[in-house]
Amino acid sequence: MDRETRMRRIWETILEIPRGRVASYGQIAEIAGIPRGARQVAYALRHVPKDMTLPWHRIITASGKSAFDPLSRHFRMQCERLTEEGVTVRNGKVNMQEFRWQPDLDELLWKPSSMWDES
């Protein structure tokens, strides 16, 4: 699978995360069909087209923390956006047991989408 296809799959997977839920980099990679691809998710997030609105703030580490420096503008923005969606952020951390996105497998497999269209 080429880089463009991987990035498209990652972006489309991220678009499926509902408000008030979060996912880890590794979880997104697995759902997008890129096992052990957490770093590729980070790469795709750094290369989102300017005209694409992506809920990037819903992607956090597997431990529930933001990947951004706690003193950075992006860290503050991520925490603010998650809080606005009803996600509790305490000391820069989200309780993954409570807020982790648990997608329905049937929906992921059978929902009409261009996600798996290789053409």
Model-derived regions, located:
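Nucleic acid-binding interface residues in structured DNA/RNA-binding domains
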Residues: 1-119
